[in-house]
Amino acid sequence: PRPAHVVAWRAVLPADAPAQPTVRVWDPFVRIFHWSLVGLFTVAFATGDESERLHLAAGYAIAGLVLLRLVWGFVGSKHARFNDFVRSPGKVRTFMALAMRFRAPRVLGHNPAGGMMILALLAMLIGISATGFMMTTDPFWGAEWVEELHEALVYASLWLIVVHIAGVVFSSIEHGENLVKA
């Protein structure tokens, strides 16, 4: 049985129930960054072997977005800043243990697991961008290990994206809120 504090995904509220206030956590930059990244990553992935020009353009745009996000992580709004969501591995483990029992606290902004995921995805994107750029330079032109590393990072990122989406769905169910609209 589901613990009493977990709201059912399709809970029906009485007509006279007070409306829950909508809290917009993510600033416009974070929203635009996120969905632009989704689109550009999709384009880059889809064109990797088909259209070098489009693939490179998407890759450079991703690198630019990541650079801007890194800066925004230090100077942006409260919940966009790294110091708001980067937690120690111990706190991430504790949070995950609570989440597995549907007892994780509700967090405005990224929860500890989400913060760790953001760091992992940013690291992957930096690695993908760096190896992609390396393949365009004379010293690494045709270096098979660079291309293999680039592709391995892409596929590792896809795995992280699946875990990220699963985490958002899980947390949305656990807390009875649509995190995509947060």
Give the ranges of each region predicted by the language model.
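Membrane-embedded alpha-helical bundles that constitute the cytochrome b-like, heme-associated redox core
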Residues: 1-182
